[in-house]
């Protein structure tokens, strides 16, 4: 049986991630199992692309099983992850009569999940929500851990809340319709888990046969890497839900990734592609500080590139890099904190990195 359940242990906010091929076809049954009764209204939030693939079937499954469900589609793309979209969700929630006993389901990638989770956190001071991620990146990263929010013109995710979902359902079948580039972008986050905490996963991803089966989207192999990634994330989040300490290691590659996304213009690089370049920069800094070997940096680079991810650092202005980094949420008391690798499978947090040490990598 290929059904996996992973507990995210957070006391009274604990929840399960259920991972199974084809689970989307039995969604009503799964909702009943976790206590979602048919009296509760369900607002499904998705986007047009996902809706065209699964939306109608998903909504019909709920309605055929006598759930009171409505679907609202938000526009796709990072530029729509904003307060205007959030306000549109509130309008629909009001018209549909979403009360405190109602529930929001996020059906889509990371943007759908982030916006839906924040809408749930703030509608009537908080209602329950469920994550059903449909991209590899959202499966292994944003759907687990409770980070929700929208962007502000001054930066990504500046408006948000920690809001844990009631449950997460993952169906690797949805990856079959994912563009190849999006799949590769998701692999950046999987490789990240290998570098920060899971040497065994890193080595599994290096094996040629596994690589081929993953690129060919074989469920058994997908379930293995998604399961490993979520276990690592669950373990870290359960120790530090609000990112006051160890949870920051999940941001390996992200500080420089956000710099690249921001300065190259959102859209030039997918999030995972920017993270891949960010991991390469962090790896180079680790060599400058004598933390890990050139061989390990090279293994990381080769693995990223073998999944069609970029590692070359784009030409961007050094002063702009500093400005963006100082606005990073990981800055504490005016000090930038960097997640740097010590070896494959272990990283640490450093706040003693001189500007000159990383600015040399930017033209």
From Swiss-Prot:
NAD(+) binds at residues 134-135, 147, 156. Keywords: Amino-acid biosynthesis, Aromatic amino acid biosynthesis, Cobalt, Cytoplasm, Lyase, Metal-binding, NAD, Nucleotide-binding, Zinc. Zn(2+) binds at residues 189, 254, 271. Pathway: Metabolic intermediate biosynthesis; chorismate biosynthesis; chorismate from D-erythrose 4-phosphate and phosphoenolpyruvate: step 2/7. GO terms for molecular function: 3-dehydroquinate synthase activity; metal ion binding; nucleotide binding. Gene3D superfamilies: 3.40.50.1970, Dehydroquinate synthase-like - alpha domain (1.20.1090.10). The keyword Heme does not apply. Its cofactor is Co(2+); Zn(2+); NAD(+). It catalyses: 7-phospho-2-dehydro-3-deoxy-D-arabino-heptonate = 3-dehydroquinate + phosphate. It is found in: Cytoplasm. GO terms for cellular component: cytoplasm. Its main location: cytoplasm. InterPro entries: Dehydroquinate_synthase (IPR050071), DHQ_synth_AroB (IPR016037), DHQ_synth_fam (IPR030963), DHQS/DOIS_N (IPR030960), DHQS_C (IPR056179). Its EC number is 4.2.3.4. Catalyzes the conversion of 3-deoxy-D-arabino-heptulosonate 7-phosphate (DAHP) to dehydroquinate (DHQ). This is 3-dehydroquinate synthase. It comes from Prochlorococcus marinus (strain AS9601).
């Amino acid at each position: 049986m290929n059904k996996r359940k992973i507990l995210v242990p957070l006391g009274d906010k604990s929840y399960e991630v259920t991972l199974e091929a084809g689970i989307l076809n039995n969604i009503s049954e799964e909702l009943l199992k976790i206590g979602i009764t048919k009296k509760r209204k369900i607002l499904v939030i998705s986007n047009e692309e996902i809706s065209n693939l699964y939306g109608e079937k998903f909504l019909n499954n709920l309605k055929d099983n006598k759930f009171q469900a409505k679907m609202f589609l938000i526009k796709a793309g990072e530029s729509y992850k904003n307060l205007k979209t959030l306000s549109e969700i509130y309008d629909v929630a009001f018209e549909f009569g979403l009360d405190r006993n109602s529930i929001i389901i996020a059906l889509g990638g990371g943007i759908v999940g982030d916006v839906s989770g924040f809408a749930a956190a703030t509608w009537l001071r908080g209602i329950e929500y469920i994550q059903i991620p449909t991209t590899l990146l959202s499966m292994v990263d944003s759907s687990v851990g409770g980070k929700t929010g929208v962007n502000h013109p001054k930066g990504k995710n500046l408006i948000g809340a920690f809001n844990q979902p009631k449950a997460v359902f993952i169906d690797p079948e949805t990856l079959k319709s994912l563009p190849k580039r999006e799949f590769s972008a998701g692999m950046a986050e999987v490789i990240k888990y290998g570098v920060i905490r899971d040497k065994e996963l890193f080595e599994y991803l290096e094996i040629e046969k596994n690589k081929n089966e993953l690129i060919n989207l074989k469920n058994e192999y997908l379930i293995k890497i998604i399961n490993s990634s979520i276990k690592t994330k669950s373990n870290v989040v359960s120790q530090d839900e609000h990112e006051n300490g160890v949870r920051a290691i999940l941001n390996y590659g992200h500080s420089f990734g956000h710099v690249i996304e921001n300065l190259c213009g959102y859209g030039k690089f997918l999030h995972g592609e920017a993270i891949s370049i960010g991991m390469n920069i962090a790896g180079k800094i680790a060599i400058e500080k004598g933390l890990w070997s050139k061989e390990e940096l090279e293994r990381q680079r080769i693995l990223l590139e073998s999944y069609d991810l970029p590692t070359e650092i784009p030409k961007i202005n050094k002063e702009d890099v500093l400005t963006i980094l100082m606005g990073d949420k990981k800055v504490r008391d005016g000090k930038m904190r960097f997640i740097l690798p010590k070896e494959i499978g272990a990283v640490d947090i450093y706040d003693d990195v001189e500007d000159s040490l990383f600015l040399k990598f930017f033209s």
